[in-house]
């Protein structure tokens, strides 16, 4: 008899709750899935049956917020205002693809230009690799909205599992309630 998958015990209560709802309702449609906890700047990757593949720190959009600003994905990066640089909360069907530099990314939402990818070098001032290691989630706010993760995490827990039909990505909110983002049906245990 196989054991019932559990969220990592060190994960936040919100991750624990949404994980249980995803697994119990098969909301992931039998595809691998990711839960991104923006408040803790942590990302978790799971097999389609809910078995943990890995967890890692993540860099996020510099602005706290749960909304996507319409049209941001079509702007040049230099035109995106700081307050528009959010990592939008929600449930997304994500697919592997390539960015404009020919590098593989997991497109969370192509039209929004939001992806999960290996941490980019950025400028010296950005200190992205240093920020990734910081225990303070506020230090992880640096990107234009994309989710930057360590290369081993991406290469071992995302790239090989999201081939083909992709998978689901659940981005937990910064300020909204889980039910406001994911609805009552998915958040049965979250009330």
Task: Report residues per predicted region.
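Residue-level detector of alpha-helix boundaries and kinks
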Residues: 3, 7, 28, 138-142
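Soluble non-cytosolic domains of exported or imported proteins
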Residues: 9-13, 30-33, 37, 144-148, ...
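Gly/Pro-biased beta-strand-loop elements
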Residues: 14-32, 36-127
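Exported/periplasmic cell-wall-interacting domains
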Residues: 85-191
